[in-house]
Amino acid sequence: MSAQTLSSTESSGSTLTRVLNGYARLCAAIARLCMVLSVIGVICLVAAVSFQIFGRHILNNTPTWAESLSLLLVLYVTMLGAAVAVRDAGHIGFESLADLLPAAGQRRLQIVVHLLVLLFGALMAWYCGQLAESVHHYKIPNLGLSEGWKYAPATLSGGLIVLFSIEHIIALLRNQKVVPAWH
């Protein structure tokens, strides 16, 4: 093998490494952003529910929009948190089967699991997107927003689950671990 071919191979390897490391950094940044948005959503949720309680018990005039807003915020907080839980391995898992396998078998099983999670995320994004599109003409009572906004967080979460599952598969193939976004 000539020196030029070897140099070209090393260069493409380092370029691939940079791209994969950049992808991991991008996924970590997206996960942190999702968590920040979830925290802001929880704060807004607490404020909306508190205002609803204040209006009902102190002012004797319940703000009708507060409950609808609270339900919508719960969807966003939950779906963003679920996507980040996939990335940061915060979801429920059963390790007993994996523990019985040799190291190579454990890695293969983990890849299969992440492929299944990726498939689930893709289907969730696709079908929730279809639902959002089918109801976008209708309005959420008391908010005046399109009903499609109820399905947007699940669509977004499905897309993020796909991105984060790809990150896990790449990390497993490189014999690395995904570093949780908050560490």
Model-derived regions: residue spans:
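Alpha-helical transmembrane segments and membrane-interface helix-loop junctions
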Residues: 1-183
